[in-house]
A protein has these predicted regions:
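Short beta-strand or tight-loop elements
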Residues: 38, 50, 118-120, 182, ...
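Histidine-centered metal-chelating micro-motifs
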Residues: 74-75, 95-97, 120-123, 207-208
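Conserved protein kinase catalytic core
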Residues: 77-78, 210-212
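FAD-binding beta-loop-beta segment adjacent to the flavin cofactor pocket
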Residues: 184-211
């Protein structure tokens, strides 16, 4: 439909990048050593005392001044705090992810390619300097309550085959040969949880999970961690929730709108959408307003977070 040069959002030392999430995670944790303890399951959180008391399933109890909850969209810790009052909901979409072995002729291996279709969109982008390409697609698909809770369903060959048969005909050739294929349901947040104890904070998807359209999950997790770190350092943590909630409301609205626009099926509306897109990507004021407020903030906060946590800057390049 059109081209958008994401490098326009770069500065001299802060640049947009694409990479595999596991690569970023390994980079961030490589110098942490044994600081992170794993294998613990929280059974109870008592936040009524001056210090927060955390009970684990192995009968171990710990007390702490601050509790930072970052255990994802299905956060058990968040459920314990809210007494299961705040639950994510199924977004009526499935995500299909994998590494491409066959490359479409119209894909630039050094750029991000977004393809739009009725009730389906997919993105292809480089993972590394070796030319490996990642494939991620979002497909409209209804699931019953039973299917939503059946996690083994999404790895069953019969289910995978049924889903792949529904992808657009023009991409079936290279989707069928995908490596490391994963299909999973997309769950999103419906509301924010304001915790009364100002020493307990949510970050990442535990704070709020979006519909998938801005590729913002990992970026927002890093950004929220950095903002919380700065808030704690300056004794302004009481403002952290309000600041994050306001930012995330904006991103959530735009993510929902993008998903709607990406999945249009009416030919006339699609025709009009494509005309608007061709014009809008050339409008610097629109890009600055609609994308710049999100991407430039992400890039700045992520680069500062990486500098703080590792002591050096991760080389980022599109």
């Amino acid at each position: 439909i059109c081209d958008l040069d994401i490098k326009n959002f770069n500065t001299d030392d802060i640049k947009y990048t694409t990479l595999k999430r596991s690569t970023l995670i390994n980079f961030l944790k490589k110098d942490l050593g044994d600081i992170i303890k794993t294998g613990f399951k929280i059974s109870k959180i008592n936040d009524q005392e001056k210090q927060i008391k955390i009970s684990f399933e192995n009968n171990v109890t710990k007390e702490c001044d601050y509790l930072i909850i970052a255990d994802g969209v299905f956060s058990k810790s968040k459920n314990l705090i809210s007494n299961n009052k705040v639950k994510p909901k199924y977004n009526d979409t499935l995500a299909i992810r994998g590494k491409l072995t066959k490359f479409p002729e119209n894909v630039n291996k050094k750029n991000v390619a977004l393809f739009l279709g009725p009730n389906f969109h997919h993105v292809i982008y480089p993972l590394n300097s070796n030319g490996d390409l990642n494939f991620i697609a979002i497909m409209k698909h209804s699931l019953s309550l039973e299917e939503q809770g059946n996690y083994s369903l999404f790895s069953e060959n019969s289910f995978i085959k049924k889903i792949l048969e529904k992808v657009p005909q023009e991409i079936k050739e290279y989707v069928t040969g995908i490596k490391e294929l994963k299909i999973f349901p997309v769950f999103v947040s419906d509301e924010f949880l304001k915790i009364q104890n100002n020493n307990i904070h949510l970050i990442g998807d535990a704070f709020f999970a979006f519909p998938p359209s801005f590729a913002q999950g990992a970026s927002q997790s890093i950004e929220s961690a950095y903002e919380l770190f700065m808030s704690l350092n300056t004794d302004k943590e009481i403002n952290f929730f309000k600041k994050r909630a306001n930012k995330l409301k904006m991103i959530n609205f735009r993510s929902k709108f993008n998903l709607f626009a990406f999945h249009l099926s009416n030919p006339l509306i699609i025709f009009l959408r494509n005309i608007f897109l061709k014009r809008l990507v050339k409008n610097k004021k629109f890009l600055e307003y609609y994308l710049g407020r999100i991407y430039k903030t992400w890039l700045l906060d992520i680069s500062l977070c990486l500098k703080w946590s590792i002591g050096t800057m991760l080389p980022l390049r599109l």
